[in-house]
Amino acid sequence: MSDKPSDAEILEGLGEIVEEVAGVSPDDVTADKSFVDDLDIDSLSMVEIAVQAEDRFGVKIPDDELANLKTVGDAVNYVSKNI
């Protein structure tokens, strides 16, 4: 499984997804940013981001886990551990 993306690649991918879903510049999508407080992403957009991340990275993000992904870094770590 050497094709596993690096955390930087996951972050870049999430940045592209967030841009598509919420119109936020990928440059603003950094590991320390809160989806809600810093990037102004609502719960409906978070579900769409999760669906696209599942498709892109081949992971499953259950609703109860999605609620725990407060920051971009949380999402990167979750994807990295579950890929």
Predicted regions and their residues:
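Thiotemplate assembly-line natural product biosynthesis machinery
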Residues: S2-D27, N82
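Short coil/turn motifs that cap or connect alpha-helices
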Residues: S25, K60-P62
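N-terminal helix-turn-helix DNA-binding core of bacterial DNA-binding proteins
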Residues: D28, D32-L39
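Two-component histidine kinase catalytic core, primarily the HATPase_c
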Residues: S45
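AMP-binding/adenylate-forming catalytic domain of the ANL superfamily
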Residues: D64-G73
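Short hydrophobic/aromatic patches at helix-to-coil boundaries
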Residues: N77-I83
